[in-house]
Amino acid sequence: MSAQTQRADPARLLVLVADDEPPIRLLCQVNLAVAGMDVLQAADGGEAIELARSSAPDLVLLDLMMPRVDGWTVAEELGADERTREIPIVFLTARATTEDRRRAEKLGALGYILKPFDPVRLAPLVTQVVERCARGEADALRKERSPQLWPADLEG
């Protein structure tokens, strides 16, 4: 399905899920679709960059450890491109170190969700982030550090 077809209903959010694990992509796809969102899937970082540039999703759920191009590089590339720099990024990862979380903050991520995660809570979090960004509240969202979007420091 083309990105234009997926944008046929502008009222529906379009989320790009970039993760090399098919079960994670499927879990996100099902839960976001049930909530009325359209979902694009990328199995590696290179594909994620291409889809973000060609489809302009409302949000990217981004794994860190992917083949070809890792999530860090994807976030850097999207942030450097004027076509994609305003797309909110929420990391969805098993990497739980404080250093990784801080690096995500520096890259401008709006969230850092640890795997395993509660899939039922995913759609409400995505909706919250997209709506707040649409109201110009991205900086406030970064500063709030909601426990649903940012885990507590793990190393003190």
Question: What feature does the model see in each segment?
Answer:
Residues A8, E131-G156:
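CheY-like receiver
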Residues D19, D63, T93:
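Active-site residues of response regulator receiver
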Residues L26-V34:
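Charged docking surfaces used in two-component/phosphorelay signaling
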Residues S55-L61:
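Active-site beta3 strand of CheY-like receiver
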Residues F117-T127, A138:
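C-terminal output helix
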